[in-house]
A protein has these predicted regions:
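Secretory targeting and sorting signals
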Residues: 2-38
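Serine-hydrolase-like catalytic core of hydrolytic proteins
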Residues: 101-286, 290, 307, 323-359, ...
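Substrate-gating cap/lid region and adjacent catalytic-acid/histidine neighborhood
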Residues: 258-261, 298-472
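Non-catalytic accessory segments of hydrolases
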Residues: 36-195, 312, 370, 381, ...
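Short, solvent-exposed turn/loop segments enriched in Gly/Ser/Thr/Pro and often Arg
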Residues: 173-175, 225-229, 434-439, 499-505
Length: 540
């Protein structure tokens, strides 16, 4: 059904809708540029050679530093190879290109340049005394595993400066470039297939470990954190034996390890999806399809509906290849994969609002009752009647709100709870939160604590643009940054502002984060109807 939203209603959330596109799809990019107002930058030595960064706002920035070789040509659909070295001092003052990707929205502005030579890392370092060993926080960006880049998250200055932490953000391959899985690829790489983006992340973690001293970092105190697909990336690393020992702590924001359409697919599922994708590009013959796909220009590789997101179902995600990823993240946690890894797990109170804004409203439609029922039957198939009985359209002001609640509860809130429960069964210490602040108030397009709303509270801005927050919300932002930084330092996120925050064996209590109220609640499972979702094994 067409949607008619007044001009005054559209203008106010426009910046936040762009932010939401970045957080969900990684869609919006701009040409890389050096930092404004930077002085003569510091020089340090890393694997490959010398680099010169920039000093901006009390933070040392080293941008676009290669941690692996180009992924083009014969390196397409292959594990990352070492980056070539260079002579002289390499400028590290501008972001590198993003990995090849599509744009999800018809009105998206020009994206930043893309290249298969995209495996570079941005490192943000606080001023610190010589000899200091700072904790390192490694951010994996979201974007449904089809979009995103490190350049979009270039405003961590307050977190870095005030928290005395290093923040490092690597690029990783996306879509078919990162997650194509075929038997012939597995045969060529010792069983590895469909995990190239995951291996890129691991290559970045090894690079950070090997070069930590160059930035004043502690290679043994590394915290993974990420949002949406970035959160699932953290989960995937928890389930990857090849990543063991590369990190010490983890924060999972709105990207749960349980019951998610982004969860690692089985090889059989991934082989079929990848074969269908290849056939759609004219590379159907099994004997020649790998050479056929490697010969295609990158732009042609993206000429497929699978390379962007049109529904809550996804095609591209890490694969359980039995080498890099050997089990589901939920099972890995229950089996003790995080027994010695402190975890923070969270979701937002109104996650579904973002997906209505980007998948429905931005395309000038709003679901009516028939659309809602049809969508539920397509997504939940045999469980659709149970979902529709629990979320009947008559129980909500509009069908759109019914859909929003289903997405929030089924795709994010309850999976976050199931992640926490699995980790605790495996002996992990876990703190769970629910972000419940509404940066846009009761806006009709992005109401409440929508998916991605917390990220500007962590980074203070995106795309080099500060995200203005009201004073109370900015105070919450500072508190979140203090908590995340303390977690990186100590393995415990509990601060005076976030106390008490139950952990260990307490499976029912969640820290509710709002500008006006920070409380511990025991109603999370009831509010989000997690009894329904507990026996729906896979969503999407």
């Amino acid at each position: 059904m067409p949607v008619d939203v007044g001009i005054s209603q559209r203008v106010r959330p426009l910046r936040w809708l762009v932010v939401a596109a970045v957080l969900v799809f990684g869609a919006v990019g701009f040409p890389a540029a050096g930092p404004a107002g930077a002085d003569e930058g510091p020089v340090t030595s890393v694997s490959g050679g010398m680099i010169r960064g920039a000093r901006v706002d009390g933070v040392l920035q080293y941008l676009g530093v290669p941690f692996a070789a180009s992924t083009g040509g014969v390196n397409r659909f292959a594990p990352p190879r070492p980056a070539p070295s260079w002579t002289g001092v390499r400028a590290a003052t501008a972001h590198g290109p993003q990995c090849p990707q599509s744009s999800p929205l018809p009105w998206t502005p020009a994206v930043q340049p893309a290249s298969e030579d995209c495996l570079a890392i941005d490192v943000y370092v606080p001023e610190h005394p010589a000899g200091t060993e700072l904790p390192i926080m490694v951010w994996f960006y979201g974007g449904a595993f089809v979009l995103g880049s490190n350049a979009q998250y270039d405003s961590p200055a307050r977190l870095v400066r005030d928290g005395q932490v290093i923040v490092a953000i690597p690029n990783y391959r996306l879509g078919p470039f990162g997650f194509l899985a075929l038997p012939e690829l597995a045969a060529a790489e010792g069983g590895m297939t469909g995990t190239y983006g995951t291996l890129d992340q691991q290559a970045a973690l090894r690079w950070i470990r090997d070069n930590a001293a160059a930035f004043g970092g502690n290679p043994d105190n590394l915290t993974l954190f990420g949002e949406s697909a970035g959160g699932m990336s953290v989960c995937t690393q928890l389930a990857a034996p090849t990543a063991r020992g590369l990190y010490a702590k983890a924060i999972i924001e709105s990207g749960s390890c349980a019951r998610s359409p982004l969860a690692p697919a089985s090889k059989e599922q991934a082989y079929q999806r990848s074969a269908d994708y290849a056939a759609g590009l004219g590379c159907a013959e099994a004997a020649t399809r790998l050479a056929c796909l490697r010969a295609l220009p990158a732009d042609r590789m993206l000429d497929s509906p699978t390379t962007t997101l049109h529904t809550m179902a996804v095609t591209w995600a890490p694969v359980r290849d039995d080498v890099v990823v050997t089990t589901s993240p939920e099972n890995a946690l229950a089996d003790g994969a995080a027994r010695d890894i402190p975890l923070v797990v969270g979701s937002n109170a109104d996650e579904g609002a973002t997906f209505l804004a980007l998948l429905d409203f931005a395309r000038a439609t709003v679901p009516d009752s028939a659309d809602y029922v049809s969508w539920a039957r397509e997504i939940f198939t045999g469980n659709a009647d149970r979902v529709l009985q629990r979320y009947p359209v008559v129980a909500f002001p509009t069908p759109a709100e019914a859909k929003q609640h289903v997405i929030t509860d089924g795709f994010f809130a309850c999976p976050a709870l199931f992640t926490t429960r699995a980790a605790r069964r495996g002996g992990a210490r876990v703190w769970q939160y629910e972000f419940n602040d509404a940066p846009l108030g009761h806006n009709p397009i992005l109401p409440g604590a929508f998916h991605g709303a917390e990220v500007p509270y962590v980074f203070s801005g995106l795309l080099g643009v500060p995200i203005p927050l009201p004073p109370a919300a900015d105070r919450l932002s500072q508190r979140i940054q203090q908590s995340w930084a303390q977690f990186a330092h100590t393995g415990n996120p509990e601060t005076p502002a976030f106390a008490p925050w139950p952990s260990a064996s307490d499976t029912t209590r969640t820290l509710e984060l709002g500008s006006d109220d920070i409380t511990v609640a025991d109603s999370f499972a009831l509010r989000h109807q997690c009894d329904l979702w507990s026996d729906i094994g896979h969503i999407g």
